[in-house]
Regions:
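Short, charged/small-residue-rich alpha-helical element at the C-terminal edge
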Residues: 165-174
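Short acidic-hydrophobic catalytic motif
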Residues: 156-160
């Protein structure tokens, strides 16, 4: 966008959404209260907050939990609330750090689907150490090792890149 994060961080952060590995949730707040609080932290216009919260809740499939306390939600729904706070201000770029960490298999599939929906509308960067997460969610991959990019390409190119490093382990019957 041409905005320098170092010289104009407040303006630049308007275009960035972030979900840390452990979402910064307040269990004593309702989903609505929390997302409204996050929108205010993002310096959103007060007249736009209600609509922005409703839109984020709908996108993340948590509309029916808007009045529930976050502490009473399952891990999967808490993660959805975390994702909602990352998109409530409608950023152009969203960073998700280990978004399926600690979720059960059904919740993982649901959150992956949600990530793909969000990625259809804006740029999403997924930070993860789980290869299956990358394969199930990403179109383009950049691999960083010790602060240096060691791979950049498509999923197909990535599969060819890691194939020589892979091996298959099989177990026979005892």
């Amino acid at each position: 966008n041409g905005i320098n994060l170092r010289t104009d961080p407040v303006e630049a952060k308007k275009y960035i959404g972030f979900l840390p590995q452990r979402p910064p949730l307040y269990p004593e707040l309702s989903v609505d209260e929390y997302l409204t609080y996050c929108a205010r932290l993002r310096l959103m216009d007060a007249r736009e907050i209600r609509q922005a919260v409703d839109t984020a809740e709908a996108k993340c499939g948590i509309t029916h939990f808007k009045k529930r306390l976050i502490g009473n939600l399952s891990g999967g729904y808490q993660q959805r609330v975390g994702i909602a706070q990352a998109i409530v201000h409608n950023p152009r770029f969203v960073v998700l750090d280990e978004p399926t960490n600690g979720l059960d298999p059904v919740q993982i599939v649901e959150v992956r689907h949600l990530i793909k929906e969000i990625a259809a509308e804006r740029a999403v960067m997924l930070s993860t150490h789980i290869l299956s997460e990358v394969q199930a969610t990403c179109d383009k991959i950049k691999m960083i090792e010790h602060g240096h990019m060691i791979f950049s390409g498509t999923m197909e190119e990535f599969n060819n890149y890691v194939e020589p490093c892979s091996f298959l382990v099989t177990f026979g019957n005892p």
